[in-house]
Amino acid sequence: MTIPAVDAAPDAPHPVGDDLWWRSAVIYQVYVRSFADANGDGTGDLAGVRERLPYLAELGVDAIWFNPWYPSPLADGGYDVSDYRDIHPAFGTLRDAELLIADALRLGIRTIVDIVPNHVSSEHPWFREALAAGPGSPERERFWFHPGKGPGGDGMPTGWVSNFQGETWTRTTNPDGTPGEWYLHLFTPEQPDLNWNHPDVRREHEDILRFWFDRGVAGVRIDSAGLLIKDPTLPEVPERPAPGQHPTEDRDEVHEVYRTWRRIADSYDGARVLVGEVWVPDPKRFADYLRPDEMHTAFNFDFMSRAWDASELRASIDLMLDAHAPVGAPSTWVLSNHDVTRPVTRYGREDSTFAFAKKRFGTPTDLELGTRRARAAALLTAALPGSLYLYQGDELGLPEVELPREVLQDPMHFRSEGVDPGRDGCRVPIPWRGTQAPFGFSPDDASAGTWLPQPADWADRTVEAQEADPGSMLRLYREALRIRRAEPALGDGHLRWLDAPPGVLAFARGDVVNVTNLSDAPADLPPHDDVLLASAPLAGDRLPPDSTAWLRVRPEPSRSRPEAP
């Protein structure tokens, strides 16, 4: 399929020369497999993304973050990379990626690619060479191969637990058929961990950064950023490890990696941004990744994981703003991503917090309640200081889909012995138009069904249907992002908390005031000049439960007057 180049947008949100764009940016996450399918094989592709770039421009985003689009056996949705310098054949070609990067930039939309430095695919040439070379070989030094414990080496080197549950070591077989060494994988056996003490590993990733920066990407999102460095003595995990002393997480030595990467990023004209996936609960140690010579930003997962509760959310906002302030980095705000339960579903549950360990089939959900809260949360997060991440489909109010077990593909499901439904439910292909599957995700003459099935009742959730509905989630997001771009007080900066009744969050950003009512009763709005936007219809000057309003509150003229002569 030939796709014409996209015309430049006259009102692109951030000029190409703006090196601080990332401090206020709205960044849209594209999970390529599920965004848009141009060739009709049931799997999303880069040509499909190119076709939909005008949609993203109209939505008002500043950048696209792509989940891994590299060649991969897809044992973990593409986070098992076998070649960092090419594109998965199901998604297109390297030339397709280059055209997409260029077309997006003409619309004022930058590109961020995913880097997975902790591990590679078990099909990566390095790992295949290591298996063939045998124990003690230089090839194996790039990974964590280790003899087992006990008679015959039958015991795993450690009892570390996988991030996907289960064991972290898999035993190899020697060329003569006898049991061999064990190798480490903090995720699945198909994702062997790299040894970041080896110079080859560091040089390779530095070259990978340059490869993509040279092709015009504006930044990289760094997967599992705190896991790269391991304690070479392989101790067991203490019950309460001291800061920096966990054998596989948040070790102090990891910061030298990111200082090197920052030097590479800063060597390019125009900002090249490092964005970290940093699951570190201690705010001070989290902020260490954001020192001026390391990453530019990192995901704020604390806010996303909190309950729909005013005191909880205010505590998280204060916690993260206070953590970022000493290092001068902007916070990032996100309600979901490709790993977590969608907000429409999460906020409609009795327990509205998020934790991987709590995911179960059949959790009761009130989608009407969840949708109201997700609309309110959309405005709340867009009003907070810093940058905003938006996962594809959240702007449509898509719920988590409880898929039949026989179609599930996520390793989190299988490694939990079927208890955890996994992450496939938030990765269902996007509905674009029409009244039945595939809802415009694939062409009408598609040769295959979508790689994950779409619910039959999604006709009113399509882009087409929501564009025609002034009260839709999509129209709310478009207006919120339009206002956010137009208002100098929004984006990067500071907030000032205002007095509010219990269950209500109110803060000022310049002359824009955000009021979010998380209580179960209407709340009085403060005196204001205009209502810029509301997530639900207002009853006079009262804000309904589970809703947010943005108000214009101009400063009152000074009451003091010079005395008459």
Predicted features, each with a name:
Residues 1-530, 535-565:
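Active-site and adjacent substrate-binding regions of carbohydrate-active enzymes
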